[in-house]
Amino acid sequence: MRKIIHVDMDCFFAAVEMRDNPALRDIPIAIGGSRERRGVISTANYPARQFGVRSAMPTAMALKLCPHLTLLPGRFVAYKEASRHVRDIFSRYTSLIEPLSLDEAWLDVTDSPHCYGSATLIAREIRQTIFNELQLTASAGVAPVKFLAKIASDLNKPNGQYVITPADVPGFLKTLPLAKIPGVGKVSAAKLENMGLRTCGDIQQCDLAMLLKRFGKFGRVLWERSQGIDERDVNSERLRKSVGVERTLAEDIHEWSDCEAIIEHLYPELERRLAIVKPDLLIARQGVKLKFNDFQQTTQEHVWPQLNKEDLIITARKTWNERRGERGVRLVGLHVTLLDPQLERQLVLGL
């Protein structure tokens, strides 16, 4: 049985700001774009969260909920440096590390000799070391598989950890809401609930063939996760090939002005996600996705060397005019395809 740890830094960007400026510790702060630029919140500290401020929330809404919110533009150089230090701490315990972003990662410590081979003790020691060396807190989840470790890391935040042993898995899954499974969003959760499926225990009673018919490949993932099956390895060579952000709309839109407003809202989040993956990575292409109310979708992209909002809007307008017809639009997405590192090195080195 494998021993997987998921480590998640607590409100990471905000925590770095509070560490470097103690005057910010007890007041509501958030990292994000300005209200005037239709920005969104990237991270909020716990005092701000008490007012309802959350990640991915429009800045204008956050300021309505918390008028005295201190808004910071973000210092990605500082965040990357802290993230590198955390990664160095991980590497003292295992070489099997799979980063998901600057502030979270999976670790496979199955064969680690540290702490008598106890994943629970390793997680505790890693968290203490992070605090000792960086004055930042982290939460952790320990489980036999990746998705359960990720869920567990969120159950005792902040500055805590939660352990799911192999013996705990059946009981834990029986009452686990399907919405907690990574990849099950609000739309999918609502669709499942309309079918009377709310927990993994409900899925365990379902026929796999029915799930495949209703949900395709996603149906198999649901069934496997509900059984505690997740055979994915912790991949230390994982390479992000693209970065995207999209929104499924509560109501279909039929006017271009509505689509443009959504792009304006999504763009800062795309900037943030790209910066987290690797700010200096070259872009191969950028593009847009529209999904229509008949569930058909179209993607339009072209070669572009750097992220550019105006170009994305022009591309989306062209796609809207040429491919929508009379259909309503139920999803709008933006994405970039990252340049292969091998090719990037060749371009940088030249001849």
From Swiss-Prot:
The active site is at 104. It catalyses: DNA(n) + a 2'-deoxyribonucleoside 5'-triphosphate = DNA(n+1) + diphosphate. InterPro entries: DNA/RNA_pol_sf, DNA_pol_Y-fam_lit_finger_sf, DNA_pol_Y-fam_little_finger, DNA_polymerase-Y, DNApol_IV, IMS_HHH_1, Rev_trsase/Diguanyl_cyclase, UmuC. One of its GO terms (biological process) is DNA-templated DNA replication. Signal peptide: none annotated. Binds 2 magnesium ions per subunit. It comes from the Bacteria. Its cofactor is Mg(2+). Its main location: cytoplasm. Pfam families: IMS, IMS_C, IMS_HHH_1. Monomer. This is DNA polymerase IV.
